[in-house]
């Protein structure tokens, strides 16, 4: 695994429920302090395991001075803070992501997270069930886009045969 210890993290809070202590570059999590750098270091291996090291390393390598802040924040907050919490297992988190991304109609991210879901042991039937459930609440157009995106990845990854 690549070492990213020397990267400084952005100073924006991830959401309203997280308070920042600007003097210490830390996030407050339920009364406890979590250092951004520690969250980044915790998040990087999780991100690489779920999305694949090739994808993550390429994202980090092509991030210029402007985009590196986004990459750092994503790794610390989404992967270190949210995915790093042990309350939910990775399969559950993957299914939640697919449902939320369907609601947001974010096909490129659905593709990425379908591959991540497969890496986390989610079955094709579970992916289909999550997308159908999201379709019932988000509407047919969003569901159709999600199914198309997922289908493309499932065929590419060999989880489905080509029609």
Identify what each model region corresponds to.
Residues 18-32:
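Short, Lys/Arg-enriched N-terminal segments with co-localized hydrophobic residues
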Residues 29-91, 119, 145-163:
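Acidic, glycine/proline-rich low-complexity segments that act as flexible tails and inter-domain linkers
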Residues 74-78, 95-102, 130-135, 146:
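Short alpha-helical scaffolding segments that buttress acidic/His motifs in well-ordered protein cores
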Residues 103-128:
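Mid-chain, well-packed structural core segment of small domains
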Residues 138-140:
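C-terminal structural segments of small proteins and small subunits
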């Amino acid at each position: 695994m690549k070492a990213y210890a020397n990267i400084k993290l952005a100073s924006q809070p991830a959401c309203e429920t997280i308070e920042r202590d600007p003097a210490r570059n830390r996030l407050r999590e339920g009364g406890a302090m979590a250092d951004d750098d520690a969250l980044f270091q915790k998040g990087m291996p999780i991100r690489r395991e779920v999305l694949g090291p090739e994808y993550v390393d390429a994202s980090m390598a092509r991030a210029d001075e402007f985009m590196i802040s986004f990459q750092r924040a994503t790794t610390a907050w989404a992967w270190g803070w949210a995915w790093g919490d042990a309350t939910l297992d990775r399969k559950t988190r993957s299914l939640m992501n697919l449902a939320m991304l369907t609601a947001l109609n974010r096909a490129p991210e659905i593709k990425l997270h379908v591959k991540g879901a497969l890496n986390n042991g989610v079955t094709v039937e579970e992916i289909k069930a999550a997308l159908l459930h999201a379709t019932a609440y988000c509407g047919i157009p969003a569901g159709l886009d999600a199914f198309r995106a997922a289908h493309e990845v499932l065929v590419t990854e060999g989880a489905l045969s080509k029609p």
